[in-house]
Amino acid sequence: MSSALPIATNLYYDNHFQRPGVKLLPNEFYTTSEDMVLVTVLGSCVAACIQDRTAGIGGMNHFMLPDDGADVGQAASDSMRYGAYAMEVLINELIKAGGRRERFEAKVFGGGAVLAGMTTMNIGDRNSEFVRRYLALEKIRIVAEDLQGSHPRKVAFMPRTGQVMVKKLRLQQEAGVAEREQALMRQNAQARAERLAAARKRVELFSSPAASKARVELFSTPAAARPKVELFGAGSRPINSNNARTTEEA
């Protein structure tokens, strides 16, 4: 129904990863303890990949904040309510399936500058700042991130192991991303009002205006502690489950 964040239903077999997969569209989420790959393509939207390694369960969401002109620090705004709702749906489903909030680790992606003409700042920047701030205030540690920039991204997440691989795409290669996200911004008022009404009822909003951001350094930053960077389609050498692979399309 339109007031709920729907579970992704596009199931397939992924020949590249040699396992069952799920493709997530905007405003969808999926959680599993199975040996699967969750795949999505992001423009200015963001995806949070959250895992409980002890329970062997994880999930992903894919969402965009409605562009109501509000700053990400305004917790009572409609867009912040919807963002909090999108995150809480994922977190609550993981808890229902046996995950423990105190063990959750997050990897966050997207927020690219692929949409123009928004009312305030670039919508990708707003989405990125929101997901960082939300997770910091929820005390869920971000162990890897690849946010902002000018590229769409293809993200593949293996919830059982926590492994993530990211491919940065040229916008012309994924022309449908911008069109799809423009359509999201033009959603009719009734559908948006229903989602926001559900968010107001079901989500307790964060309100701390100055919490410190828990974030890791970006992959391109030369620092010893950053996550290792590997190619999306690289050979199967062992990696730590906290690492994310990434590459840019030439």
From Swiss-Prot:
The keyword Transcription regulation does not apply. CDD domains: CheD (cd16352). GO terms for molecular function: protein-glutamine glutaminase activity. Disulfide bonds: none annotated. One of its GO terms (biological process) is chemotaxis. It catalyses: L-glutaminyl-[protein] + H2O = L-glutamyl-[protein] + NH4(+). Coiled coil: none annotated. InterPro entries: CheD-like_sf, Chemorcpt_Glu_NH3ase_CheD, Cytotoxic_necrot_fac-like_cat. Gene3D superfamilies: 3.30.1330.200. Belongs to the CheD family. Probably deamidates glutamine residues to glutamate on methyl-accepting chemotaxis receptors (MCPs), playing an important role in chemotaxis. This is Probable chemoreceptor glutamine deamidase CheD. The gene is cheD.
